[in-house]
A protein has these predicted regions:
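N-terminal leader/targeting and accessory segments in enzymes
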Residues: 1-91, 95, 270, 382, ...
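Nucleotide phosphate-binding/pyrophosphate-handling subdomain across enzymes
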Residues: 3, 15-23, 262-367
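Residues in the short beta-alpha loop(s) of Rossmann-like NAD(P)-binding domains
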Residues: 10, 33-35, 137, 215-216, ...
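Residue-level signal for inorganic ion chemistry
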Residues: 20, 66, 107, 136, ...
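Beta-strand->loop->alpha-helix junctions that form or flank phosphate-binding loops
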Residues: 51-54, 90-94, 227-246, 298-300, ...
Length: 443
């Protein structure tokens, strides 16, 4: 019996274990950290052996294949040992893809992934399609394939997931943008990171579709190095040669495979970056053949995504916005660009090799104060203090919200859009956003 060992006992690892067992493999799950109770129960219910707080070498190194959770870097000592002995290492998505014939709509990019993925899922669901949501959001693809299979899956893919995918194929691949992010995981080399994103094209044929942002210079450069076999569907802000999704005279326009228009003002998502997300999602729906009235309705009633430019409430006529999902400079830039009132910006967390220079002119133009929130804020002081804005240094969310409350004047906006990962002070970016919302609502 072939032995599969799964490194990481979270959503993706536990789901992969259930599918592997269903397909007749000898399965073992190992996690260096603690495994959460719901995942322990899932593994126990299926009589799958697991360990936490350690990696037992003799139980791992004898695997025929390893399924690695995306959060584990290739530099991890156990992963290095496995690579040295030549054991194949794949992702949960790669594994799940072997056991389903469902149509896969896959979304990647540095920013906008979750919003675009959620919007496509919303459109497909509204159209009555049998669809699952998976990857970085939703439930484990492997668990859905094992226990509640669907005809379509809408999958958000990070570069980490794409790294360990080899035979998997997207029927519809979407590449939103490529800007520096996670460089700490790619030897601080932007080329390596960009290359990982382009893996979304692998194994595609003429029968498949590739949707991408035509105005992104990095995508344009990368595409020159890659043979694209799929039908291409570029989108851009304005109508230009070859572009099939754009805005023309304030009309949101899809030109292929069928023509569709609606007023831009009816789109539920606002801001320039969300326009691109809406174009990508509309093209995916159009390719699948969803009726235009459903596309229109879904684009106009989509409620948005938690922790992404989420309006919390107004206190003393100051609007508080939770954009905790902005874990890189580009995401923060887009958030700031969409602000229409003087803004107090909350920055900070675990730095991922950020270059803050592109942000400086916009911060100077839009911001009336800065609040730094992190275990170590020195790099923020070094980059932003010279702008001459009022600055407050905080090391907890309660101190941060208190500082914002004291600084903000009626008519202004407080924006949590930190540019950084959350792991220095919080469990994750959701925890950061939830703490912010709770404290703001208690002001």
């Amino acid at each position: 019996m072939k032995r599969i060992v799964i490194l990481g006992g979270g959503e993706s690892g536990a789901g992969a274990a259930v599918l592997a067992q269903k397909e007749g493999f000898d399965v073992f799950v190992s996690d260096l950290s603690a495994i959460k109770e719901p995942y322990k129960k899932l593994l126990d219910d299926h009589h799958i052996e697991w360990e936490e707080g350690q990696h037992t070498a003799e139980k791992i190194l004898n695997a025929d294949e390893i399924i690695k959770s995306p959060g584990i870097p290739k530099e991890a000592p156990m992963v290095q040992k496995l690579m040295q002995q030549g054991t194949p290492i794949i992702s949960e998505i790669e594994f799940a893809g072997r056991y389903t014939h469902a149509k896969m709509v896959c979304i990647t990019g540095s920013n906008g992934k979750t919003t675009t993925t959620s919007l496509i899922y919303h459109i497909f669901k509204t159209a009555g399609l049998d669809v699952g949501l998976a990857g970085n959001i939703g439930h484990s693809l492997a668990l859905q394939v094992a226990e509640s299979p669907h005809e379509y899956y809408v999958i958000e893919l990070s570069s980490f997931q794409l790294d360990n995918m080899y035979q998997f194929k997207a029927d519809v691949a979407i590449l939103l943008n490529i800007t520096p992010d996670h460089l700490d995981r790619y030897d601080n080399c932007f080329e390596n990171y960009a290359e990982a994103k382009l893996r979304i094209l692998q194994n595609q044929t003429q029968a498949d579709s590739f949707i991408y942002w035509k105005d992104d210079p990095v995508i344009a450069k990368e595409l020159q190095k890659h043979a694209v076999h799929a039908q291409t569907y570029p989108f851009a802000a304005h109508k230009e040669n070859g572009v099939v999704g754009y805005i023309e005279q304030e009309q949101y326009t899809l030109a292929h495979p069928s023509t569709f228009q609606m007023p831009q003002s009816e789109l539920s998502l606002t801001g320039k970056h969300n326009l691109y997300n809406s174009l990508a999602a509309g093209l995916a729906a159009n390719i699948v053949g969803i009726p235009h009235d459903i596309i229109r309705r879904s684009l106009s009633d989509f409620p948005g995504v938690e922790h992404r430019l989420e309006k919390v409430c107004k206190v003393n006529n100051v609007l508080y916005i939770n954009d905790s999902k902005a874990t890189n400079v580009d995401a923060c830039w887009y958030a700031l660009e969409s602000m229409t009132t003087p803004t107090i910006l909350i920055l900070g967390g675990r730095d991922k090799g950020n270059d803050y220079k592109p942000l400086l002119p916009l911060v100077k133009e839009r911001c009336v104060g800065l609040v730094y929130l992190g275990a170590n804020n020195q790099k923020l002081h070094d980059n932003f203090d010279a702008l001459g804005l009022p600055v407050r240094d905080t090391h907890s969310m309660s101190d941060c919200v208190k500082a914002c409350f004291e600084m903000a004047k009626p008519g202004e906006t407080v924006l949590l859009s930190p540019c950084c990962a959350s792991f220095d002070l919080f469990k994750n970016m959701e925890d950061r956003g939830e703490q912010f919302k709770t404290l703001v609502r208690n002001l």
